[in-house]
């Protein structure tokens, strides 16, 4: 039995390597930018910070990322890294692709382009880290314990204390177990939601400050789910609405103004397996998406949750992340266990396809990022550079990439009249 499994693993490894080689060969045609960076330890979390600096006279801009570590037994850290991304006018052409380093974009080597700026000691691995929109120096993290930690990174030295002591600025209490889901309210400063394996969602208001020491108790605990709560997200336009998804296969919509914390405003059987993630559309107040272990992303309208608007089908395994693009109302992306990050375009749903195109996936599947050879742990859309995504996988790899413009810009190239006549004759 073990031999059969070993054989299957070897075959899978071979297939993965073969697919990666093909992907690498095709990057110059599929991407305007690819930066591949091996982190010292895998990160389970990634998020672009909102700041960008454009140094005068340079052909790049500086961006920052929030990362974490997942070490074997060594000290873990919350990490802020600085990234140089070339400007659009920097040289991009296929001859600049460095097949050894897996980089592309007129841009020598990645070494020196991605630098760790701040490392803060952390208790156990960082399951997820998210900055507070009203003050991006404040970062909340999920730990392997039940506590949610809050760090103001301006109050910590950039090099961690060698003792390994973790001293968060706040410790948020309320959960009994660890989890992953974490969401700051973009309309109410300091309001933080967290999802947990203990079947609950906790809400804190950190603007009130701790009663004593550094501990803040939950303001409310929502107990509607009957299984592990995988993810939670505030609505982006209504300060009192949020959604949660869980292993009970349900999507729940909650209103913090309600006088009950045990019953959501709406509950939907969203998928045929665990629901792992959700994302509200930043442009359309009624639209949200959920991703599931049933390998699909579902599209929902808050005005009629009884009816699933659409099911996006192409992933070969569980979906753990789904995020709408910050720049385009109809674009969302999803990723997970199948090592693929899929970018979808709602506006293409129902478009006619040739049989050949249909083999690659439905018309709304705009792009498949195939650069990872291990499960994708998290990804983030860059808020300042449209179509730039950073994705991290379990094998320590971080990729910063942008699909080729001709993929998302549908305009047909102008064909000179002389050629048109030749075609028509």
From Swiss-Prot:
Q: Name one GO biological process term.
A: chromatin organization
Any matching Pfam family: WD40
Keyword annotations of the record: Chaperone, Chromatin regulator, DNA replication, Nucleus, Repeat, Repressor, Transcription, Transcription regulation, WD repeat
- Chief localization class? nucleus
Subcellular location, record wording? Nucleus
Q: Does the keyword Isomerase apply?
A: no
Q: List the disulfide bonds.
A: none
> Would I find Transport among this entry's keywords?
no
Query: Which Gene Ontology CC terms are recorded?
Result: ESC/E(Z) complex; nucleus; NuRD complex
Report each WD repeat as a residue range. 47-122, 128-173, 181-217, 228-269, 275-312, 318-369, 376-403
**Family the UniProt entry places it in:** Belongs to the WD repeat RBAP46/RBAP48/MSI1 family.
Subunit note = Binds directly to helix 1 of the histone fold of histone H4, a region that is not accessible when H4 is in chromatin.
Main role?
Core histone-binding subunit that may target chromatin remodeling factors, histone acetyltransferases and histone deacetylases to their histone substrates in a manner that is regulated by nucleosomal DNA. Component of several complexes which regulate chromatin metabolism.
Write down what this protein is called. Answer: Histone-binding protein RBBP7
| Gene name tied to this protein | rbbp7
């Amino acid at each position: 039995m073990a031999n059969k499994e070993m054989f299957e693993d070897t075959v899978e490894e071979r297939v993965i390597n073969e697919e990666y080689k093909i992907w690498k060969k095709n990057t110059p045609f599929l991407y305007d930018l690819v930066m591949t960076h091996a982190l010292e330890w895998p990160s389970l979390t990634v998020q672009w910070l909102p700041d960008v600096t454009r140094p005068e006279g340079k052909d790049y801009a500086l961006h920052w990322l929030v990362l974490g570590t997942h070490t074997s037994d060594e000290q873990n850290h919350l990490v802020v890294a600085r990234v140089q991304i070339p400007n659009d006018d920097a040289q991009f052409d296929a001859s600049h692709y460095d097949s050894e380093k897996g980089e592309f974009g007129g841009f020598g080597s990645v070494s020196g382009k991605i630098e760790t700026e701040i490392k803060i000691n952390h208790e156990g691995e960082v399951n997820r880290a998210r900055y507070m929109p009203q003050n991006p120096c404040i970062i909340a993290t999920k730990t392997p314990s039940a506590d949610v930690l809050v760090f103001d990174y301006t109050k910590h030295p950039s090099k961690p204390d060698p003792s390994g002591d973790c001293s968060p600025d706040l410790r948020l209490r309320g959960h009994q177990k660890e989890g992953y889901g974490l969401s700051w309210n973009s309309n109410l400063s300091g309001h933080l939601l967290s999802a947990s394996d203990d079947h609950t969602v906790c809400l804190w208001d950190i603007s009130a400050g701790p009663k004593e020491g550094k501990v803040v108790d939950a303001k409310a605990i929502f107990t509607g789910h009957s299984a592990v709560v995988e993810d939670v997200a505030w609505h982006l336009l209504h300060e009192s609405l949020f959604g949660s998804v869980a292993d009970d296969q349900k999507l729940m919509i909650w209103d913090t103004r309600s006088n009950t914390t045990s019953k959501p405003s709406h509950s939907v059987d969203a998928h045929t397996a665990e629901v792992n993630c959700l994302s509200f559309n930043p442009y359309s107040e009624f639209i949200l998406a959920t991703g599931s272990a049933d390998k699909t992303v579902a599209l929902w309208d808050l005005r009629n949750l009884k009816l699933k608007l659409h099911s996006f089908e192409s992933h070969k395994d569980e979906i753990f992340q789904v995020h709408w693009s910050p720049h385009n109302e109809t674009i969302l992306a999803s990723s997970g266990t199948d090592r693929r990050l899929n970018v979808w375009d709602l506006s293409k749903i129902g478009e006619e396809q040739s049989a050949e195109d249909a083999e690659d996936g439905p018309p709304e599947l705009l792009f498949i990022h195939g650069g990872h050879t291990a499960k994708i742990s998290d990804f983030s859309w860059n808020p300042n550079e449209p179509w730039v995504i950073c994705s991290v996988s379990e094998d320590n790899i971080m990729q910063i990439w942008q699909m080729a413009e001709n993929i998302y810009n549908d305009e047909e190239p102008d064909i000179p009249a002389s050629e048109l006549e030749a075609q028509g004759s």
